A protein has these predicted regions:
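Positively charged n-region of N-terminal signal peptides that target proteins for export
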Residues: 1-6
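Bacterial N-terminal signal peptides
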Residues: 8-18
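Surface-exposed acidic/polar loop and edge beta-strand patches at domain peripheries
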Residues: 22-198, 209-212, 218-352
Length: 352
């Protein structure tokens, strides 16, 4: 899929569901370019008025619009159109994303073990709760929390950005309701002269309530913008087994997840995988496009607690979860490493 040429920009009004659409060309979104001479990446900047991503699901920091290695591309909008009326993603021709899911690259969502954001259960309608990386959000009613509802952003916190030629650091400081407050720093770094990107997270609990959450990295991988199909392979250091019916779209062979055919139309693949252990070494996910001969291996430094794989024809998206617990006055750090490579041709001995 070619990167989307035009994207609809959303301006959120004070009432939660009053949304206006306005058209912007891609260059209108605030961004910075990173390069280490091997990798080249475009990183979008958080901006409440003009930012590429302004939903209430994912962390606003670290949204990557593109990354290139040896003439291969890895990230870019997986959706072909944007519609604020769409709850999540409408799969078809075209693929249409709603405001909370219209993201690009590796993006993180913080979600509690109960499936809700911090402080949502305690908050009454009209009061605020806490979505790390987004802000203090207003609870609309007594319905169950949903990542796909666009809650009004009452306070986006204090944000700052620092950057150099091959790195960028985002910081958000925020006090939410129910005693939650934090300082959250994310650093994206391209290692010198290596095809490696590192994302480092640092969360400091500055509030009175303990932060007990899970966070998953939603990796929207559109390698070379080619159709998801038999050439798209996801592999692991363990033998996984699917906990849901894959609907005839996928199969597991040993340590690999394969797609049975080209996904098309409204085909949607999703399953959660079991089989990983309690060691961080199992957080190693390899995604390859064996048609274009490009791949990436994603490693985390914490044990997996859940692992989902979502795919449509334009994207393959591993969703690995880890647990984060931070007592008041304490801090937590975690890291993801992305190593990019070219897939060897049959008969070659190793990746490059």
């Amino acid at each position: 899929m070619n990167p989307v040429p035009w994207i609809v920009c959303i301006i959120q009004l004070t009432f939660p569901f009053l949304i206006m659409a306005q058209t912007y060309s891609p260059q209108d979104y605030p961004a910075t370019e990173l390069s280490n001479g091997v990798l080249r990446a475009k990183v979008y900047l958080p901006d409440a008025k003009k930012g590429f991503y302004r939903g209430t699901r994912f962390d606003w920091a670290g949204v990557i619009g593109s990354l290139e290695y040896k003439e291969h591309s890895y990230f870019g909008p997986f959706f072909e159109k944007f519609d604020p009326a769409v709850e999540d993603v409408a799969i078809g021709n075209p693929v249409v994303a709603g405001i909370n899911s219209a993201a690009s690259g590796p993006v993180e969502e913080f979600i509690g073990r109960d499936g809700a954001a911090l402080g949502y259960a305690e908050a009454k309608p009209g009061e605020t709760f806490c979505k790390i990386g987004v802000g203090a959000l207003r609870k609309i009613d007594n319905a169950a929390y949903s990542s796909y509802v666009h809650y009004p952003i009452v306070d986006g916190g204090k944000r700052s950005v620092k950057n150099g030629p091959d790195w960028i650091e985002f910081t958000q400081e925020l006090a939410c309701g129910s005693g939650y407050a934090y300082r959250y720093t994310k650093t994206i770094r391209l290692l010198k002269n290596e095809p490696v990107m590192v994302i480092e997270d640092w969360l400091v609990n500055t509030g009175k309530s303990s932060i007990d959450t899970q966070v998953y990295d939603h990796n929207f991988l559109s390698i070379d913008h080619e159709n998801t199909g038999p050439g798209s392979v996801v592999s692991f250091p363990f033998a996984p087994h699917a906990t849901q019916d894959m609907g005839g779209l996928g199969e597991i062979r040993g340590k690999e997840l394969l797609f049975s055919r080209n996904l098309q139309g409204n085909d949607t693949f999703y399953t959660e995988l079991a089989g990983f252990g309690k060691q961080a070494a199992d957080y190693e996910i390899r995604v390859e496009n064996r048609r274009s001969r490009a791949g990436v291996v994603i490693r985390g430094d914490r044990p997996l607690v859940n692992l989902g794989i979502w795919a449509v024809r334009t994207v393959v998206a591993p969703e690995p979860y880890v647990e984060i617990t931070v007592a008041p006055g304490e801090e937590a750090r975690w890291k993801y490493t992305y190593q990019y490579y070219t897939v060897p041709n049959p008969g070659d001995s190793k990746t490059k």
